[in-house]
UniProtKB/Swiss-Prot annotation:
Residues reported in the UniProt entry to bind glycerol: R82, E83, Y134, D246, Q247
Function according to Swiss-Prot or TrEMBL: Key enzyme in the regulation of glycerol uptake and metabolism. Catalyzes the phosphorylation of glycerol to yield sn-glycerol 3-phosphate.
InterPro entries tied to this protein: ATPase_NBD (IPR043129), Carb_kinase_FGGY (IPR000577), Carb_kinase_FGGY_CS (IPR018483), FGGY_C (IPR018485), FGGY_N (IPR018484), Glycerol_kin (IPR005999)
Name the record gives this protein: Glycerol kinase
NCBIfam families the UniProt entry points to: glycerol_kin (TIGR01311), PRK00047.1 (NF000756)
Taxonomic lineage: Bacteria, Bacillati, Actinomycetota, Actinomycetes, Micrococcales
Protein EC: 2.7.1.30
BP-aspect Gene Ontology terms: glycerol catabolic process; glycerol metabolic process; glycerol-3-phosphate metabolic process
Annotated metabolic or biological route of this protein: Polyol metabolism; glycerol degradation via glycerol kinase pathway; sn-glycerol 3-phosphate from glycerol: step 1/1
A single GO molecular function term of this UniProt record: ATP binding
Keywords: ATP-binding, Glycerol metabolism, Kinase, Nucleotide-binding, Transferase
Key word ATP-binding present: yes
SS bond list: none
Length: 505
């Protein structure tokens, strides 16, 4: 029997391939960043062909570093940035436009027109999501409306849509030569086009958006064999057997299998998911109802999700745009030069505000500035913004679910930052727990694939493999915590109502 499972993690800033052994331990990794394309304010794009090239490269890197042959890989799992929309020609295999990324806000007018008098809640009862620029459906409509010949080609049946999971899978399984056009329930649940009850495309909503259903991939479970890597591929013949959107994959990798268990992933943005079991919980507090996972023929499991647009990308912005730091980890040392935020609060509403506000008219603000404030204070305010936004989402989860969390499992790149993790525990008032394998997104996809082919026996193996690495316990006085949180909420209100007729994006 093969000894390893390989996960492809097609993320917002990079693509990675990670090889895991049976204990869930990382054996080798390959990683390559792709270009972030900003054609206009509020627009964010990726080149799908660059992504596909990078995926092949990182698979080769991982196999080489592990000295592992394809014959020793039991299965391949795919996890991906969700919502990001790719539209391509089924005959040529070429994208008709760049991928429109989940952070992109160009579809605001489309969203407002679709909502009409019913507003953002128009489809929420059916799809679990508010009408927002975040989701795939309006992005597909924008491409069909704005790329010459795209709508006609789509109506002829010549175009295919997918998030990057589908794009990678289609290419891996042969592309124009019989590529499998499939997505899983978790990714489909982020398009605004899938009915949460039936787990099938909703033709009425697709028609409202002018999207031919023929473009849409077949919806399958998160753990089953979808196809095999093409003959000329580095993993020729290896089954591709797991697909989970990145945040659902992290939830799976964190072994959040019981109702009320939650995790928070700290990446480009932050995403907190709470398992709600086989019952959908409709949010009254600005959260999303989404599919958490579906293992083969087992019933689907749902989740509440709080999505935060900008957290880690704020640190990248300080590095790349303002040149305040030269590498992202330097933010911690800069923050340690001061004891607090000096009264400064940084609300990074670069793409509007996601949960729990859903304010597309908001834009970033740095408030509370005096001549006392230094770069150290701004660095600390940037880190604290991540913790404050997560606290607001956790409050909403408590209100919707009636569950009081006793601890929060965390993962993602920013959990290496000790200053942030301690402040997160302080502001939440609960323990924050980091697992030994922090790459839970890739791990979750690996588990889904491995379970499908019998490499792992099921959720119990995931639970048995999970191990705690570090725990942060709240240390802040409650009065201080409440004062800081009140000031944060005041700062958030200063970002509202910025985008109007005088401001395009």
């Amino acid at each position: 029997m093969a000894d390893y499972v390989l996960a492809i993690d097609q993320g917002t800033t990079s693509s990675r391939a990670i090889i895991f052994d049976h204990s869930g331990t990382i054996v080798a990794t390959g990683q390559k960043e792709h270009e972030q394309i900003f054609p206009r304010a509020g627009w964010v794009e990726h080149d799908p062909e660059e992504i596909w090239t990078n995926v092949r490269d990182v698979v080769g890197q991982a196999l080489g570093r592990a000295s592992v042959r394809a014959s020793n890989i039991a299965a391949i799992g795919i996890t991906n940035q969700r919502e990001t929309a790719v539209v391509w020609d089924r005959t040529t295999g070429k994208p008709v436009y760049n991928a429109i990324v989940w952070q992109d806000t160009r579809t605001q007018r489309i969203v407002e027109e679709l909502g009409g008098s019913e507003g953002a809640e128009k489809y929420k009862a059916r799809v679990g999501l508010p009408l927002a620029t975040y989701f795939s459906g309006p992005k597909i409509k924008w491409i069909l409306d704005n790329v010459d010949g795209a709508r006609e080609a789509a109506e002829r049946g010549d175009l295919l849509f997918g998030n990057t999971d589908t794009w990678v899978l289609w290419n891996m399984t042969g592309g124009v030569n019989g590529g499998v056009h499939v997505t899983d329930v978790t990714n489909a649940s982020r398009t605004m086009l899938m009915d949460l009850d039936t787990l099938s495309w909703n033709p009425d909503i697709a028609a409202d958006m002018g999207i031919p259903v023929s473009m849409l991939p077949e919806i399958r479970s998160s753990s089953e064999v979808y196809g095999k890597d093409r003959e000329e591929g580095l993993l020729a013949g290896v089954p591709i057997a797991g697909i989970l959107g990145d945040q659902q994959a992290a939830t799976f990798g964190q072994a959040c299998f019981e109702i009320g268990m939650a995790k928070n992933t700290y990446g480009t943005g932050n995403f907190m998911l709470m398992n709600t079991g086989t019952e959908q919980v409709a949010s009254e507090n600005g959260l999303l109802t989404t599919v958490c996972y579906k293992i083969g023929d087992q019933p689907q499991v749902y989740a509440l999700e709080g999505s935060i647009a900008v957290t880690g990308s704020l640190v990248q912005w300080l590095r790349d745009n303002l040149k305040v730091i030269s590498t992202a980890p330097e933010i911690e040392n800069l923050a340690l030069t001061v004891e607090d935020n000096g009264g400064a609060y940084f609300v990074p509403a670069f793409s509007g505000l996601f949960a729990p506000y859903w304010r597309a008219d908001a834009r970033g603000a740095l408030v509370g500035l005096t001549r006392y404030v230094s770069l150290g204070h701004i660095a600390r305010a940037a880190l604290e913004a991540t913790a404050f936004q997560s606290a607001e989402v956790l409050d909403a989860m408590k209100a919707d679910s009636g569950v009081d969390l006793t601890e929060l499992k965390v993962d993602g790149g920013m959990v290496a930052n000790e200053v942030l993790m301690q402040f997160q525990a302080d502001i939440l008032g609960v323990d924050v727990v980091r697992p030994k394998v922090a790459e839970t997104t890739a791990l979750g996809a690996a588990y889904a694939a491995g379970i499908a082919v019998g490499f792992w026996n099921g959720e119990q193996d995931v639970i048995d493999n999970w191990a705690e690495d570090k725990r942060w316990t709240p240390q802040m006085d409650r009065g201080d915590r409440d004062r800081l949180y009140r000031n944060w909420k005041k700062a958030v209100t200063k970002t509202f109502d910025w985008v109007d007729d005088d401001v395009e994006n």
